[in-house]
Amino acid sequence: MGFWHRIRGHVTSWAFLVPFLAFALFPFYWAIITSFKADANLYDLRRNPFWFAKTDAVTHQPYHKDIIVPASYPAAPIHWEIKQGDHTTRSDSEANPKPIARIGDQVVYSPVDGTLSQIEVPEGSTARPVDVIGTIEVENPTVTHYKFLASTPFYRWMQVSLLTGLAVVILTVLIAVPAAYALARLKFHGNRVIGIAIFLTYLIPPTILFIPFSQFVGALHVDNTIWSLILSYPTFTIPFCTWLLMGFFRSVPKEIEERALLDGATRMQMLRLVVIPVVLPGILTAAIFAFTLSFQEYVYGLTFISSTANRTLPVGISVEMVRGDVYFWGPLMASAVLGSLPVVIVYGLSLDYFISGMTTGAVK
Amino acid sequence: MAEVNLENVEKRFGETWAVAGIDLTVHDQEFVILVGPSGCGKTTTLRMIAGLEDVSAGDIRIGGRSVVNLPPRDRDIAMVFQSYALYPHMDVYRNMAFSLQLRRVPKKEIDRRVNEVAEILGLTPQLKRKPRQLSGGQRQRVAVGAALCRQSGVLLFDEPLSNLDAKLRVHMRTELKRLHQKVRSTMVYVTHDQVEAMTMGDRIVIMNGGKIMQVATPLEAYDKPKNRFVAGFIGTPPMNFFSGEWVDSKVQLGGGVKLPYPRSSPNGTKSVVFGIRPEHIYVRPSGNKGETAVPSVIEVVEPLGHDVVATASCGAGVFQLAAEIHDGLKPQDKLDLQFDMARAYLFDRDTECVL
């Protein structure tokens, strides 16, 4: 008896939970630390996927970043100088960074507002474009990758994805809620068959459907617009949400519908005042699933949209942030982290609804 | 005036008959109980009155107006469901006010009625609670309260007490009876519990197999059952039955047991079922006329307190009798039990009707 006896239940449940948590959360951990790692740390293979490091795994030197003469600078040898006092100053604000070196009349700024270590270029030496003219100690962890996103259409893609998601959710709820109620409650010929058929349509993968769909998209003249997505995403969100909602509607005690009818409600009033409020957690769940499904959709987004500005987030990231076989891991992971935020926020806000059983107390 | 008339009402589900043609009149302000075993059609009958089931044939009139083609909301009825059917997202006040709000009753009037009903049912402190925060008994009272607020002519109850524990059920039984005397609505109450039926109803309707077996006051149902089903259904412990032959004013049961049967009965020989209630079998002679001693052996004794239910056997078979604990019955006792023939019944073995 005593300590072990008391915590045995906890030990058992944690023993089951920990492997699951490790499995489920590890990708997020990796994405998050990658998005904040300086490139030097990121490409230091022995330091991956571990926590931020201060020094190189091989040389045990602090991570440095080379300062390179901009490629845009004229190719001819140039005279450049560093003014005394410039090379050790730290930029105090982003708005007014202090120059750290001058090449001719051009000024090379600190690429990040981190600590500046040394610029060891003798006075009067010449440097060509892409020459290393100094090194800078890198900031680790760093928000460089996130800042870089501002120079890409990332926020535009986010906007497209959010807008599409919202429109798809509205469309899905408007169509799936009445459909699910009819299939779950009303007795009509063939409602079982229709219910199963609706679910089967969800099982057909988009990779098969995108070619016929592109014909529709072309015929409607909505290709390369957000409308092509708003109209095609419901083809998988509606069946899924209808199926999901049927279960919720079935769990509504029939007696409270009957009581509403006896209390003087018409069928529409009964739906609006009794059934819908009771299945609200279910509708919210369906809305979240519809949002998540459309937010992460890839195939239609890739095929129906051709201009960079109209891309959705997943397509934009993978198309624009991978050049050939070069993966910009930092910005990629930064956009993955930012991209998962809307879903995390939506889930977080509605967690209480998932957990609380709204129907408790309805019957018995 | 809210008299409920059922005329040859039938209900079929496909090939099966749930209700096989019943006629019934429930008078204004009467408390009528539909009672019977499960599947006897009592709930279906109630739901047809409510309009939740269509009638397959026949007519239902409420207050003289045929309602078979009216939706439930136009029938001037309120109903209390077995599972209470409270709206889980509304507090107690809104649960009770909902039907009035739908009917656009003025806010002041709603407030007055809800508060009055809440006062009667002792729900005033709970008005702001959600159903899930209430106990089973409180939920039950909210369901009754919501029905009462309507002040409809007819109140329907579908086994409203069956989800309560035994003690609360007895208490609510009294409460509902008191309530009926107060609100004077016509009440139709469905239950499978014959004790509930006997204690609460002005009249009880005993149903079996989709048919009405008897409509009677509790006393009539107990004293003058029309048939073997009613005789066996009403009363606890249930009536004892022995099959036998009726020959020359005597009932011959198995094992050579012969009982005189004083009432006028058909002549000649007839196959009958002899029925006698446990409480009409006495341990010692009371001196009443018409008692017949039957040699028996006590097998099991079940004391309930003051009363004892004993199981005994005689030549004709096993039966139960009600005795008092001070009678001192013990298993294996051999004694002559007195059958009160004046209160025994004979049923036709084929038609099961009382003779």
Model region roles, listed by residue range:
Chain A
Residues 2-93, 98-364:
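A structural signal for multi-pass alpha-helical bundles of membrane permease subunits
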